[in-house]
Amino acid sequence: QYFPVLSSGEEIATPVKKSQLPKSYITLDFSDKAMLKKFVQQLSSISDTIKSEIQTVQHTPSKATEDLLTITMTDGNKILVPLSEVAKKLPYYEKIKPQLTETSVVDMEAGIFSYRNS
């Protein structure tokens, strides 16, 4: 089941079928509704180019970063970025992407670097 999320970050309680989803959509996997809302609000400041390339967003906390997200892009690349820094760091993906020669993980948890996605 899919639950639509408004641009305000509010989740609609009525589920929709996959066949009812728009042509392009982002799958969001958050158990914490406050984090979901914060992500959606930060997403509003991200370019349409980057937004159109996002496939899924998952909350994947690490020992060092409780609010770490894993963002899977339509090209297969993955971006690791703290929720608190999405608006600040995610725009750098447009500059990094052309430099990637293979499917990669772009780690924005502390600084920004990339490595091959194994």
Please give the residue ranges for each predicted region:
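Extracytoplasmic segments of membrane-associated envelope/inner-membrane machinery
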Residues: 1-56
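Flexible glycine-/small-residue-rich
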Residues: 30, 61, 71-75, 83, ...
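Extracytoplasmic/luminal low-complexity segments enriched in Pro/Gly and acidic/polar residues
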Residues: 77-118
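Short polybasic amphipathic segments
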Residues: 2-4, 69-72
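Short linear motifs in intrinsically disordered
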Residues: 1, 55-63, 98
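Alpha-helix N-cap/helix-start and coil->helix boundary motif
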Residues: 33, 64, 86-90
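Short hydrophobic/aromatic-rich motifs at helix boundaries and adjacent loops
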Residues: 11-15, 62-67
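Envelope-exposed proteins and targeting segments
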Residues: 24, 53-55, 65-69, 75-77, ...
